[in-house]
Amino acid sequence: MKAKQEIKKIKEFDYDAWIESKELKDIFPPRIMLLWWIGILGMLNYNLVQIVPNSGVALLSVSTFIVGCGLCIGFMLGIEQKKNR
């Protein structure tokens, strides 16, 4: 019975109004999205390098990927600390 009530609540929830009340930048801060894209591009470059081996491109893509991941992790930790204050 309780499960049916929960399902009913979920069905009645107005997602459009909730999304409009939250701005997209609050859900996905632009800096973090940019860093995720850096990481994703680094991964794609790394995959291309495995197909077309070239030491210069490999070094660039691996460093891009590592920097992107490091920055993402750093920002995530920073946000967690900000919330905890």
UniProtKB/Swiss-Prot annotation:
<keyword id="KW-1043">Host membrane</keyword>
<keyword id="KW-1133">Transmembrane helix</keyword>
<feature type="transmembrane region" description="Helical">
    <location>
        <begin position="59"/>
        <end position="79"/>
    </location>
</feature>
<keyword id="KW-0472">Membrane</keyword>
<dbReference type="GO" id="GO:0016020">
    <property type="term" value="C:membrane"/>
</dbReference>
<protein>
    <recommendedName>
        <fullName>Putative transmembrane protein ORF28</fullName>
    </recommendedName>
</protein>
<keyword id="KW-0812">Transmembrane</keyword>
<feature type="transmembrane region" description="Helical">
    <location>
        <begin position="32"/>
        <end position="52"/>
    </location>
</feature>
<dbReference type="GO" id="GO:0033644">
    <property type="term" value="C:host cell membrane"/>
</dbReference>
